[in-house]
Structures are given as C-alpha cells and as structure tokens.
C-alpha cells in the first residue's frame, strides 16, 4: 500500500504524468515534505519526490500565463507533468525550494535558435 511522505497536504489536484509512452492521469498531493503523484489506474505506481531531492522545477511562461506542463529535475532523473493548476504547484514549490530553484524554461523557439547558433559558432 502507498504511504504518503507528507504530514500535511497544501494542495490536492488532478494531473497527468508523462513517465512512459502515453500519460497517466492521477492526483497530485503537494505537502510539507514532498510532491506526490498517484495514478488513478494503479495507485501502487506512485511517484514521490521529496523537496530535498529536487534540483530545479520549471515551466514555460508567456506573458503572465504559466503553461500547463512543468518539469522537475532531481539528482537522478527528470519528470514531466501537466496540471490545470501548474501555477499553484509552482508557487507552493517556491515556498519550499526558494526562488533560485523555480525557473522559467526556454520556449521552443528559444531552444531551436540556441541549437542553430551553436551549429554556426566558431570552434577554437
């Protein structure tokens, strides 16, 4: 049986985890100790990410609008999630992690232009 790491829950919302081919719909539990995701199909395939192991969390921002998708980087892996409440999740993460670990991810155009620039950059 799944055992939560959190003692108190600050936000409970629905979302999608993109860990394999196709997404898994489930519930987010964001609390005092960790960010947790429990799939609706099989709760035993849960994802628990303690705040201490997160190195960076970010989402795409255009204007003042935060995208539904957000990315979590840990010491060992990278997780991709989507939620209608991604802005609320990032605000709670900022309280636990600090401003330096919550970042604005580059847009698709910025990523493509950076790769093109790196192709034509002088190599010494």
Feature locations, PLM:
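Canonical phosphoinositide-binding patch of PH/PH-like domains
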Residues: 72-95
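Phosphoinositide-binding peripheral membrane targeting modules
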Residues: 17-71, 75
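Charged/polar, solvent-exposed surface patches and flexible loops
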Residues: 56, 91-95, 114, 118
